[in-house]
Amino acid sequence: LLFAAAPAFGQDIFVMGEVHDNPAHHSVQAKRVADLRPAALVFEMLTPEQAKRISPGQLEDRDALANLLEWDESGWPDFGFYHSIMTAAPQARIYGAGVPREAARSVGDNGLAAVFGAGAEDYGLTQPLDEAEQAAREALQAKAHCDALPAAILPMMVDVQRLRDAALARKARTAMIETGGPVAVITGNGHARRDWGMPALLAMAAPDLDIHVLGQGEDDRPPEGSFDEIVYSPAPVRPDPCDAFR
């Protein structure tokens, strides 16, 4: 593992990015969480409803907890990756910031701000992105989906990404208020990026919070976007993700 900067633990909110299927990235997160001893853990991978099912005594039985959360139907990688992070801070209250699929699907019909609900303006959701950022985000969505998506749906894909960013920011803010912090946020690199992801929206809504952002690269490739710190780990052997679109 190569570290681009020394870890920092004086923050209110520590955002920890990942490539979801990279085991080394989750090992880094678990180590950082153990060192940080956060009062709260916020997961992109859990909806608020799922997080409410978890009580501290349930962390010991990984398989039972996975069944309780219906993890196998969630589409996320091996639950063990995230269970190791939960057990690294057994004292932490667990929050879910994931946007339910039904809500994400409704963005195209109902609009970004309406789906988010109260406080949308605080997180910039009532304003359009500037043209350059909108174009850059649409290009990233196209690339992430192997240029297989119709161009007409790319704006909605960007709106869903913004919705997920804002949901993460809102939940981190709530966790900070309810627990006093520190708060660790576990999410993908795309949501963790400081320039336009969850940290940017959180800083907009709660400028007094001190935020540190960790991005995780693979081999010598940094993640897209800007971060306070980048850690590099080997990329796992994986099939070509574009095979699914062929």
What would you call each of these model-derived segments?
Residues 167-176, 184, 191-246:
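C-terminal regions of proteins
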Residues 19-22, 46-50, 100-104, 189-193, ...:
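Solvent-exposed loop/turn segments at secondary-structure junctions
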Residues 12-14, 39, 181-187:
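Generic beta-sheet signal
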Residues 54-175:
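A substrate-binding/cap region within the structured catalytic cores of diverse enzymes
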Residues 40-46, 212-216:
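Short internal beta-strands
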Residues 9-37:
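Zymogen propeptides
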Residues 28, 48-55:
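Membrane-embedded segments
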